[in-house]
Amino acid sequence: MYHLHPCETLRQVFAARPFQGAEPERASFIFVGLDANYSPDIEHSAIFPQLLEYLSDGVAFWRKTGVHHPFLLPAYGNKDGAKYHRAFASIGFRPEHAPLVSFVELLHLPTYGQSKLAVGDLDAVHLRWVDRVIRAGSARYVFIPGSVASRMRQSGCFPWLPREPESEGGSLGVWQRTTTTTVYCHYHLSTHGWQEKKKREQIAEIRALVKDA
């Protein structure tokens, strides 16, 4: 179950480009999530114009502002989503990496509140597109948390995705490795507590991949 975001403008912009950042088909780094979640009153936020600008052209936004997401703008403060994007920023991507980085969600619609996605909530056409992006696009590195991978397996649209990632000795697990693309398993970037140490180790390993990009 999910709560469809009430802002019509946000829904329209997201429908035209159901991803965030660079075009996924051309990106080298793809981060797969469950849904794009926003505050229910985001339309009245000081950063709403910048959010629409970002969703319309994430690459241009990053180059213009120096931050990869409007939730990192000072006017947004410490509201929902800021923690995730601060953790993401610690990876070390810079504005010149903007054309290489994309965020793709399993749900094709923007949401608000707490989502508990079931397979029936997901659109098969969108999921097949996600599969093509991962397996037939330009991605060198794809990052899928375990909770997201679980929904992907349940959908039946990703038969290549194993039940458990392989360990290659580092903190990142590996869902799949081909001659062109490595699909990694990592902790969600908003996790904390006992997962924090390993999450930081995983971020350091992703940072090393960025240096080679």
Predicted feature locations:
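C-terminal capping/extension of enzyme domains
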Residues: 1-10, 118-131, 150-213
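A polyanion-binding, active-site-adjacent surface
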Residues: 1-138, 147
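Extended, charge-rich low-complexity interaction segments
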Residues: 134-142, 212-213
